[in-house]
UniProtKB/Swiss-Prot annotation:
Organism taxonomic ancestry: Bacteria, Pseudomonadati, Pseudomonadota, Gammaproteobacteria, Enterobacterales
Residue spans crossing the bilayer: none
GO biological process, one term: DNA-templated transcription termination
InterPro entries: NusB-like_sf, NusB_fam, NusB_RsmB_TIM44
Function noted in UniProt: Involved in transcription antitermination. Required for transcription of ribosomal RNA (rRNA) genes. Binds specifically to the boxA antiterminator sequence of the ribosomal RNA (rrn) operons.
Keywords of the record: RNA-binding, Transcription, Transcription antitermination, Transcription regulation
Entry-linked Gene3D superfamilies: NusB-like
Entry's family note: Belongs to the NusB family.
Any one GO MF annotation of this record: RNA binding
Gene Ontology terms: cellular component: cytosol
The keyword Cytoplasm is annotated on this UniProt entry: no
Protein name: Transcription antitermination protein NusB
Covalent S-S links between cysteines: none
Organism listed in the record: Serratia proteamaculans (strain 568)
NCBIfam families for the chain: nusB
Length: 138
């Protein structure tokens, strides 16, 4: 699959995870609704589904990885930043095929696209502290 399709999968995953985090609906329902309402012709659907289900199943673990380095309580973290960080940490922890730098750079780009003005700096700072303990740089 092309890198652009993977990027679109991550973009869609941020949006769907944002919805899931706010609604607390079943992740399968969120996925179904998202796919029925969005134009996903240029999206790696398999990867989108894996990110969505993988982050949902491992949300507690992913949150526990980031919580110690946050400058605020996890509950105070913005929903966009939380979704972006969960995706990046999932890729670093569970997807050895995704290069270290790709996971971090993609998270920064997602934060620039969807987050508040300086959220990409926050995301970069958190990942800079957490990522080396999850996986060695390559």
């Amino acid at each position: 699959m092309k890198p652009a399709a993977r990027r679109r999968a991550r973009e869609c995953a941020v949006q769907a995870l944002y919805s899931w985090q706010l609604s607390k609906n079943d992740i399968a329902d969120v996925e179904h609704q998202f796919l029925s309402e969005q134009d996903v012709k240029d999206v790696d659907i398999v990867y989108f589904r894996e990110l969505l289900s993988g982050v949902a199943v491992n949300a507690g673990l992913l949150d526990s990885l980031m919580a110690p380095v946050l400058s605020r309580q996890l509950e105070e973290l913005g929903q966009v930043e939380r979704a972006v960080l969960r995706i990046a940490l999932y890729e670093l922890k569970m997807r050895e095929d995704v290069p270290y730098k790709v996971a971090i750079n993609e998270a920064i780009e997602l934060a620039k696209t969807f987050g508040a003005e300086d959220s990409h700096k926050f995301v970069n700072g958190v990942l800079d502290k957490v990522a080396p303990s999850i996986r060695k740089k390559k």
